Amino acid sequence: MNHSDSTSYSDITLIGAGIMSATLGTLLAELVPHKSITIFEQLAEVALESSNEWNNAGTGHSALCELNYTEQNAQGEVKIERAMKICEDFQLSLQLWSYLVEQGKIDKPQEFIHRIPHISFVQGEDNVAFLRKRYQQLSGHHLFSGMQFSRDHAQLAKWMPLIMQNRSATEILAASYIENGTDVNFGSLTRKLCAYLTQQGKALKLMHRVKDIKQLANGDWQLTVLDQQQQQIIHRTKFVFIGCGGGSLPLLQKSAIDAGKKIGGFPVSGLFMVCRNPELVAKHYAKVYGKAKLGAPPMSVPHLDTRFIDGKQSLLFGPFASFTLKFLKQGSVFDLPKSIQASNFSSVMAAGIKNLPLANYLIKQALLTKEQRMVELRDFIPDANSEDWQVLVAGKRVQVLIDGEMRFGTEVVTAEDGSLAVLLGASPGASISVKAMLDVLLKCFSDELPAWQHKLQHMLPSYQISLRDDAELYATLKRRFEASLLLDQ
C-alpha cells in the first residue's frame, strides 16, 4: 500500500453505489444542485450487490400480494396498517421515477419497470379463510381497488396457468389477483440514476473502498479511502450517507456515533431457482406470492415471479434463505465475527438466543440439495422438471439487531447532529427507497426542509399528503405515472 496520502473534499459523500445512494444523490442533486457530491463504490461497477437485478426478486413492493405484510392476530383479525403504509410509500418511488422520466433526466422506463399482475396464492382451508379476510379488508380501499378473489380452479387457471397445470380438482386453493403490480429492475434503475448524477458533475469513484471514518473536532467527517491502485486518499466532507448494504454496519461501527453502538447484524444468504425455458416462461405472467410455512421466517415467503432482465423474460422461484457469515456477496467470512463488539455484545447475544430456531432453520436450508429445493417448487408447479431450473445465488441481507430484537425491515440510523446517516436492514428496501431517503432528509436536513418544500412537492406530489385518505389525488397520480412510465401500454 502506498501511504503517500492525497486529499479531496465534497459537501456530500455517499458510500455505496446502490439504489439507496443513487436515490439520495438524485434528490440532493435536485434540491441543492450547487453542492458537490462524491459517491465511493468499492466494486468495478454500480449496483453489483443487493441492488443488482439478479440479487433480488425485483418486486415493486406495494403490499398487493405479500401476505407477510398483513398478519393475522390471535383473534383471527387481519391487520392491514403495514400494507397501507408500504403501498403509500411505494407511490413516492413511482412519483420520483415518473418525474425524472418526464423531465428527461432518465429515459427508457421500459428498461427498469414493467406492469405485471400481483397474485396471492394459498392452499388449505385455514389459509383460504385468511386470504378471504385479507381480500375483504383490502379490496374496499382505493389503494387496492380492482383486487379480485377466487377459489374456482377455472378462474385460477386463467390467472396462473403454469401453477394450475395438472392439479387435482379436489385441492383446496384460493388466490387474490390485482393487475397493477410491477416488476422493477433495480440494477437498471440504479445505473440510470448514477449516469444522471455524473452528467450533473457529481463524482462517482469506482474501485474506491472506504476503510475508515471518523468525525473531526469541527463536525466534518474524515474518510480514509483506498483507490484502485491501493493508494490512500483522505476525503473530508460535511455530510455522509452510508448506503452500502451489508457493508454499512462495519462503517457505522467505525463512525462511533452513539446511535450505532448497540446495533448488531445477522446476515442471511439467498438462493433462487431460475428458469429460462421459453415454453414455460410463456405460460406464467405474474408475481405469485405464497404463505411462509409454519416456523419459517418472513424473508422466506415463497414466490414465483416473471422477471424482465436484459430485455428477456425468465422465471424466478424462491427465496431459499440460508446461513452465512458474509455481509456482502463479495464479502468475508469474518464479517459477522468482526461485527460483534463490546458495545453490542449483549444485544447480539440476546437476539441470538431468541432466534435460535431461525439459525437452525437457515442451517437446514443451506444443506438442501437441488432436488430438495425442487420439492418446494412443486408446491407451486406440480410437474416442474429439475432440468428446466438452475440454482442462482442471490444477494446477502443483514437483518438488524437492536435491543436484543431482530428487526425485519428497513432502518435509518443517524448521528445526533444530523451529519451522518446509515441505511440498514432489508425488505421492502429498494421499493421504498424514496421514502427511506426522505426520512434521511427529515433527520439530517431539517433546517433546510422548509426551503425545499415547493421543490419536493413538485417532484413528489403526494409529499406530506396521505394518499390513503385522498382517493381523487391517488387516481390522478396513478394515471400520470402509468403514462410516463409506460405502464398503460
UniProtKB/Swiss-Prot annotation:
Gene3D superfamilies on file: D-Amino Acid Oxidase, subunit A, domain 2, FAD/NAD(P)-binding domain
Entry keyword annotation includes Flavoprotein: yes
Domain of life assignment: Bacteria
Enzyme Commission designation: 1.1.5.4
UniProt keyword annotations, A-Z: FAD, Flavoprotein, Oxidoreductase, Tricarboxylic acid cycle
Pathway(s) it belongs to: Carbohydrate metabolism; tricarboxylic acid cycle; oxaloacetate from (S)-malate (quinone route): step 1/1
Catalytic activity: (S)-malate + a quinone = a quinol + oxaloacetate
GO molecular function: 2-hydroxyglutarate dehydrogenase activity; L-malate dehydrogenase (quinone) activity
Top EC class for this record: oxidoreductase
Family: Belongs to the MQO family.
Classification via HAMAP family: MQO (MF_00212)
Protein name (record): Probable malate:quinone oxidoreductase
Organism listed in the record: Haemophilus ducreyi (strain 35000HP / ATCC 700724)
